[in-house]
């Protein structure tokens, strides 16, 4: 029987010196010393990261000067460029844009930090500063390497990052790099989590393999975190997972020692700022970690970290929460095949999705890893196991609502992979102890044996993942089967081919489809630009068609504002949840497209109806309509309010008549009583579907306006015709003149509470999601301003950053030596109980 010395595997003793390490110290320490297990562990991480780089850079596309395309990713291109060109120069990280959805608050409800990374890489600094910073940073870097002061590795890494950020990088390359950086460093993040939490090199190295299993998971493609989801546009989610893994490492160590409050706060804040859904999992893990070792000190540690991370991220999170009533709910349908998604994955969303790696085997290993974690006092494993169980419970019992339960699956799967890796690592450790027990010469041979097994396991797993990716040297295809070294499989992981499609870019797409190709897309953009020069800038409603994938993604026309410098806006945009105009767009899309996407659930969609569609275009002040199908083009040519202006490839472009941005109302608006902004959608949709001939309904308004319930039919109270002139629209403002004051007019810009008006009363939210103002002066100005909550949030973040610096400089004086309860002592107490019971039995 192998005798296990609990003290030799205690987390606190294994992690005793970790607090003295720099952030990257543990990584480079193994390379500098002669410790073979550490070297093999680090080399495992290196191989894992290099393997990912090999996969995400097919044919060198990662470094080609092209514009990424493919799914949502191809539409994400708009965002960082708008941030760079419009928001940051105006000292904003969120603000108004007219480019999509008749205007919406950009980065108010979508994560801005990942986009900032792209901007920083793309812009760099101006050339003189580049030269000075490059010279200075290089000199400092050399001095750091020579003198090796305290924390020299951290400062050296910072200098390298600074050099990277000051050099301008092509926008497409910067975008591609940030897209995959989360994938590239996830194995390192998993390894670092293990080392911070007190694990030895071998199990930490195995965690990097667990990250690989998650990245190349073939069972989901839009939930977030794996390669396919990242290529679908969920790169912010992947970055958030990386931050979350490192935070968990600091968390596990922090509840035992009280160390690293500042660093833990930074990574928890980054987790939320990169993606809120991952932050929910981080909060869950935090509560579980403290529950496994509750004490006054651990509660204080977590409270400080929570307050710091919350205040640091307040500049974005607080306005998001405060104005959450203006979020759009896409109506995601809850996944109810519970046994499939949590156990065997035999009912997945698409034919190309597979149960790879096999989830049943992973779960068996994860259960074993959980038992080992309790037996051998691995707090990381205990916390992950409890968190995975709670996540699975939430997946089943979370009611259908705004939080789509499918988004919980990545955290569940990742936890299982990490636990499975811990199980395999423990088996290797036990085998190493067995070797040591039977070795009469070198008592360290067991450690080498364990390390060798761990390294071989990681390498073997990389080959296992490489086979369905079909990238191994010497591999060949015979029919649908891939052959390599006697191995035959028809399994195909689409990840690498998806990368090639996306990163080869818009520029490399050719007209292989009925519609498509870069040249055709460029001609369409140029045609719209030319029309705008002659007939004015404005919004475009383009017919949706699956055939548009020939451009790289059916969302390609969303980039018209990007390519026309904001002159031509697209009614459809990417950030569906960021605008309450989104459902009205999809209703129009359904009326004006032969094959609409109808992306939002539970809406009263109509089939193709040119009359209703044009009426709705006029309601939203849309200037142009572009048809691509024969049906849409034929019907549009017959409509009296549409004038054909140009043709471009398969597109026919029409001018929409009587569609100004400001319009006189026929009837007095009606204020809907007891209606909150969060309940706006249903009555607004009902009013929208009735057409433009009815009474505009509002939330709040002038005292003399009629008040109605949602069921009431408002009276038709005619208003005098108001002459409107000199309409001038900018990115975040609208100016116009009226010929008569005191009469309400409709402003066809999406409503948001940050809008302020000068020279009028209002603005009030009006159906479908526009604004009504009552001029008090001839000249009326609307401007998108900072709300009070925005200013308060920035102040809290400023205070948080100062507090972060103070906490980082102050040593935690709380006593972490005792706890009210500790899961790490369960096995010890159980062993003592068994020994005591055996002793009593022997005495009797």
Could you describe each region identified by the protein language model?
Residues 91, 95, 111-112, 268, ...:
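Extracytoplasmic/lumenal acceptor-recognition loop(s) of multi-pass membrane glycoenzymes
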Residues 281-308, 433-443:
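Perimembrane helix-loop-helix junctions
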Residues 132-135, 237-242, 277, 315-316, ...:
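Alpha-helical transmembrane segments at the extracellular/periplasmic loop-to-helix junctions
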Residues 70, 301-375, 476-526, 690-695:
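Periplasmic/ER-lumenal interhelical loops and adjacent helix-loop junctions
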Residues 138-151, 239-263:
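Membrane-interface transmembrane helices that cradle and orient dolichyl/undecaprenyl
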Residues 11-13, 130, 702-838:
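Active-site-proximal, structured, solvent-exposed surfaces of multi-pass membrane proteins
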Residues 49-131, 153, 165-245, 249-250, ...:
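Active-site lumenal/periplasmic loops and adjacent helix-entry segments of GT-C-fold
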Residues 250, 261-275, 287, 308-311:
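Membrane-interface alpha helices of multi-pass inner-membrane proteins
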């Amino acid at each position: 029987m192998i005798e296990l010395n609990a003290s030799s595997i205690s987390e606190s003793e294994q992690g005793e010196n970790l607090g003295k390490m720099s952030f990257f110290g543990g990584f480079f320490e193994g390379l500098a010393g002669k410790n073979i297990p550490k070297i093999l562990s680090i080399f495992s991480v290196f191989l894992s990261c290099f393997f990912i780089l090999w996969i995400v850079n097919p044919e060198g596309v990662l470094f080609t000067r092209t514009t990424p395309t493919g799914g949502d990713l191809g539409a994400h291109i708009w965002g960082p460029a708008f941030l760079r060109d419009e928001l940051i120069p105006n000292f904003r990280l969120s603000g108004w844009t007219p480019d999509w959805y008749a205007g919406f608050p950009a980065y108010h409800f979508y994560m801005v930090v990942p986009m900032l990374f792209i901007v920083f890489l793309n812009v760099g600094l101006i050339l003189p500063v580049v030269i000075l910073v490059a010279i200075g940073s290089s000199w400092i870097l050399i001095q750091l390497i020579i003198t090796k002061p305290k924390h020299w590795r951290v400062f050296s890494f910072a200098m390298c990052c600074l050099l990277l950020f000051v050099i301008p990088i092509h926008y497409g390359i910067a975008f591609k790099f940030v897209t995959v950086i989360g994938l590239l460093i996830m194995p390192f993040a998993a390894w670092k989590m293990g080392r911070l939490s007190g694990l030895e090199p071998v199990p930490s190295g195995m965690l990097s393999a667990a990250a690989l299993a998650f990245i190349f998971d073939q069972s989901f493609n839009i939930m977030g975190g794996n390669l396919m989801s990242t290529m679908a546009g969920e790169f912010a989610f992947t970055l958030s997972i990386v931050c979350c893994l490192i935070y968990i490492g600091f968390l596990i160590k922090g509840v035992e020692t009280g160390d690293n409050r500042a660093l833990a706060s930074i990574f928890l804040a980054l987790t939320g700022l990169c993606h809120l859904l991952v932050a929910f999992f981080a909060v869950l893990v935090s509560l579980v970690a403290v529950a496994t070792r509750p004490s006054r000190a651990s509660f204080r540690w977590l409270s400080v970290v929570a307050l710091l991370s919350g205040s640091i991220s307040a500049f974005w999170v607080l306005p998001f929460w405060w104005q959450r009533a203006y979020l759009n709910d896409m109506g995601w349908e809850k996944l109810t095949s519970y046994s499939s998604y949590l156990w065997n994955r035999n009912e997945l969303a698409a034919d190309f999705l597979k149960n790879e790696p096999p989830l049943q085997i992973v779960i068996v290993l994860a259960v074993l890893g959980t038992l080992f974690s309790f037996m051998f006092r691995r707090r990381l494993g205990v916390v992950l196991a409890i968190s995975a169980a709670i996540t699975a419970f939430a997946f089943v019992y979370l009611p259908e609502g705004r939080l789509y339960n499918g988004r919980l699956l990545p955290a569940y799967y990742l936890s299982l992979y990490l636990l499975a890796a811990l199980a395999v690592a423990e088996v290797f450790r036990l085998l190493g102890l067995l070797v040591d027990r039977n070795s009469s010469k070198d008592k360290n041979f067991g450690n080498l044996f364990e390390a060798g097994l761990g390294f071989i396991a990681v390498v073997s797993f990389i080959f296992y993942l490489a086979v369905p990716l079909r990238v191994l040297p010497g591999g060949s295809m015979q029919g649908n089967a891939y052959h390599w070294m006697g191995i035959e499989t028809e399994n195909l992981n689409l990840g690498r081919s998806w990368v090639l499609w996306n990163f080869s870019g818009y520029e490399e797409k050719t007209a292989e489809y009925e519609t498509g190709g870069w040249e055709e897309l460029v001609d369409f953009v140029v045609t719209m630009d030319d029309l705008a020069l002659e007939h004015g800038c404005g919004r475009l409603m383009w017919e949706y068609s699956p055939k548009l994938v020939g451009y790289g993604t059916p969302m390609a026309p969303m980039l018209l504002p990007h390519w026309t410098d904001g002159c031509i806006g697209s009614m459809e945009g990417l950030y569906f949840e960021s605008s309450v105009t989104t459902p009205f767009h999809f209703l129009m899309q359904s009326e004006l497209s032969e094959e609409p996407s109808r992306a939002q659930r539970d809406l009263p969609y109509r089939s193709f109806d040119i009359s209703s569609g044009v009426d709705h275009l006029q309601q939203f002040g849309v200037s142009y309509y572009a048809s691509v199908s024969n049906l849409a083009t034929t019907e549009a040519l017959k409509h009296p309010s549409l004038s054909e202006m140009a043709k471009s490839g398969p597109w026919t472009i029409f001018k929409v008549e009587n569609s100004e941005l400001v319009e006189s109302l026929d009837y007095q608006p009606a204020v809907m009583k007891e209606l909150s902004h969060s309940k706006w959608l249903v009555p607004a949709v009902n009013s929208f579907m009735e057409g433009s001939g009815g009474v505009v309904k509002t939330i709040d308004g002038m005292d003399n306006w009629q008040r109605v319930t949602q069921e009431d039919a408002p009276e038709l109270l005619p208003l005098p015709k108001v002459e409107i002139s000199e309409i001038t629209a900018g990115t975040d403002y609208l100016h116009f003149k009226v010929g008569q004051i005191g009469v309400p007019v409709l402003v066809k810009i999406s409503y948001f509470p940050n809008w302020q008006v000068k020279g009028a009363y209002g603005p009030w939210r009006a159906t479908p999601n526009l604004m009504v103002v009552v001029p008090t002066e001839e000249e009326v100005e609307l401007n998108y301003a900072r709300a009070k909550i925005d200013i308060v949030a920035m102040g809290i973040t400023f205070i948080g950053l100062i507090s972060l610096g103070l906490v980082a400089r102050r040593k935690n004086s709380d006593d972490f030596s005792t706890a009210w309860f500790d899961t790490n002592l369960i096995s010890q107490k159980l062993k003592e109980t068994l020994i005591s019971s055996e002793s009593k039995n022997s005495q009797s």
